[in-house]
Amino acid sequence: MGVRFRQKLMSGGATQNGSFCHGQNQRGVTDAPSFADAADGLSFGIDLPPCAEGPGLLLTADGGRYQGTLFGAQGYGEGELVFTTGMMGYQESLTDPSFAGQVLTFTYPLIGNYGIHAGASESSGVWPRGVVVRHAMHQPDHRHSIAPVEDLLRLHNVPGIQGIDTRSITRRVRELGTVLCVFGPEEDEDLLRSRLKEMTSPDLEDLVEQVSISSPVVLNPGALDVLDQPLPRLGALDCGIKFNILRNLCKHFEVVWCPPETSFDILTNEYQIDALFCSNGPGYPAHTGKATMARNTLAQAVQARLPVMGICLGHQLMGLASGLQTYKMRYGHRGANQPVVDLKTGRVSITSQNHGFAVADPDAGMLAAHPSGACSPPGENLHGAEVTVRFVNANDRTVEGLDLVGHPSFTVQFHPEACPGPHDAAPLFEQFRDIVDRSI
């Protein structure tokens, strides 16, 4: 039941009873579509598959062996082992499409103490292929809780393991880099080792295709501003977009939520957009699938001098379109406490981030790189605009944002919508609206 329900809730399908319908209360909007929230099945009382239990074992490709106890859905968890440092916001992290293909370790020792809340997810699915925690709370204490976290995992057929020394895992990943892993019943150790030996990197998969919407839809048709004037129309390329990004965009634009392969001609001729946005998402930025299609659309938009904003993977795709390389980081930035420096103003913002790849600095090169040396091949500038680094990470000096000189376009590696996380960078959405207004 969990697998079928997860497939039904993929971000491409509108539903009459979905929790996500941000255009519903906007001025001028009379018929806004709604979309399923990952926790809707818990609200509807859908029967859940059996819960995993008993001794579990987690193995890493570099020889690590960790014992724990299984929870969540039955089955095997396997993927790239990563960690996130957020103390809260586990529901938002579990439903963030950028975690597709990964086994997510929470460094905070207690996960699930306030349960799962209706309408608080960031997408229609749970995307990690496994979850690792020190302790999962089975009896949450919050008036708005509808279920414990393990029920959300069962609903979406995602296995978990607890009782693990997550501090040891975090140190291992920080020192040696992200690594493939597998976990399951301890009695299946031989099978686990066999699965680990045969496993291939999720970076080889077209993860963007797995998490993106299947057909275009206008989220807030007819949206008006406070003066009853039509909002500018924005095309939002979905590479794995979070609901809270869409909420923020709908405050400033009439949003056309589009698949990543949507061509520039369709966006301009059929939907007549005034600006373009490219979202966050999972996987290898230079993958030849849907990510490359979105990159080409970004380049065409810049050539046409259309205002463009990119976040996270959208930032990396703009870097590739600008002739810069992208590369795999040692352990990435995943958490809600990453300091970012604006090189233009000197201001430091604390930001929420979730990425394992970065854009190479034009001068300093590939900072905080993974030991594997994985990176995209050198490319050409597809749009012809000069690019400068606008933001850098205060900890490791990696690139956190780009400005396109002489063009109404910019990108950031961090998440200004910050769900979860601090809101220091939230004004970037309003700044982009100002850029669009000046360009129309």
Named regions from a protein language model:
Residues G401-S439:
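A glycine-centered loop/beta-turn motif at secondary-structure junctions
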Residues P159, R233, P307-M309, Q325, ...:
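Proline-centered loop/turn at the N-terminus of a beta-strand
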Residues E270-P362, G421-Q431, I435:
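Cysteine-nucleophile active-site neighborhood
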Residues R233-D238, T351-S352, F410-F414:
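Active-site-proximal beta-strand elements of phosphoester/diester hydrolases
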Residues R347-G406, I440:
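Catalytic beta-strand/loop cores that center a nucleophilic Ser/Cys/Thr
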Residues L70-G72, P109, N354, L404, ...:
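Residue-level structural signal for beta-strand termini and adjacent loop
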Residues G2-G13, N17-G18, H22, R27-D265, ...:
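RNA-binding accessory domains that recognize and position tRNA/RNA substrates
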